[in-house]
Amino acid sequence: MNQPIPTGSRDILPEEMRELRAIESTLAELFESRGYGEVATPTIEFHDVIALADRPKDGSYRFFDEAGSMLALRSDMTVPIARLVANRFASQDGPFRLRYSGSAYRTVRPQRGQMREFRQIGIELSGAAAPGGTVEIVELLVGALDAVGLDRAVVGLGDADLFRQLLADMGVEGAARDRILDCLARHDLVAIEAEAGDLAGIGEEQRAAIVALSSLRGGSEVLERASEIGGAAVERASSRLAETYEGLEAKGMAGRVQLDLGLLRDLGYYTGAILEVYDPALGHVLGGGGRYDDLLGRFGRAMPAAGFALYLERVHIAQAEEERMAREQGARSKEQGASGVGGAA
């Protein structure tokens, strides 16, 4: 009898497992070479710890232990590591450079093809403020993508506070604000336009600003355009993005980064720069991260922090697709070369 497994989970067979381990090993060696030491945290945390992430939609699997305490499977890796840094390095000075790999778990929406269990590999840098700390993690992220053959991948760079401040200055609050932020997190620009059209108490110019900023992306030129559209409301976020982008230009990394002013993630702890990774060979985000300068303070050890995580299975799929495309391009070039030689004869 064929026994099914839950939707959103999967078995991994030996060949794929070897390939996943190879990616993991390559990235682990890179992170270690940059001074990031490996840590591990429990799969199970007290739910109160997970709740400190302040995610609008928690998504964690919760249950009770024998003593009646509410526990949860970790729904990401950043929060447990923030707890670890605050608890285990309480008397030490930073910065702390840590790396990890492990599985996280979230509830899924039926029929969406979402995974309940997903493996992440990433780094967390605690005790390094922006813009220097942000530049460091973006530089390492680009290096990680190159190390696994994803040199066409692009890092989207936005700011978590840009739209929050813009909407606050417009007086957009409560459920209306949350709907727009949710649309941004889902990259649903059509829905943003609809939501902006339904907002009460703001003018057409403000509606147009919401829609225009949500789709504004490119190089440093977009920051000037953002100031023209959003005015003082976006000045702080634009200034931070400009500082980070200048640091990336100095490192020769700006060509791999796209400023995306509509970028927002559904994790409530981000406070400044936010990142997402895209590769043209895959229609899904490969990973993401950003700054979470307030999160460690919730555990009693206030310090600036930033990090990123890559979805291991998605990186593997993108890598395989890039290799397939390279083989096909090589075969076409060979055929064209042979055809040219034959024609000359």
At which residue positions do the language-model features occur?
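Short polybasic linear motifs
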Residues: 331-336
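Residue-level "edge-of-site" marker
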Residues: 44, 158, 180, 261
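Generic N-terminal amphipathic, Lys/Arg-enriched alpha-helix
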Residues: 4-13, 226
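Positively charged, Gly/Ser-enriched RNA/tRNA-binding surfaces
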Residues: 16-34, 45-46, 56, 78-91, ...
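Short, conserved phosphate-binding/catalytic loop or strand-edge motifs used
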Residues: 117-121, 157-165
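Polyanion/phosphate-binding surface patch
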Residues: 39-71
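Acidic, His- and aromatic-enriched active-site or binding-groove loops in soluble protein domains
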Residues: 59-67, 172-193, 279
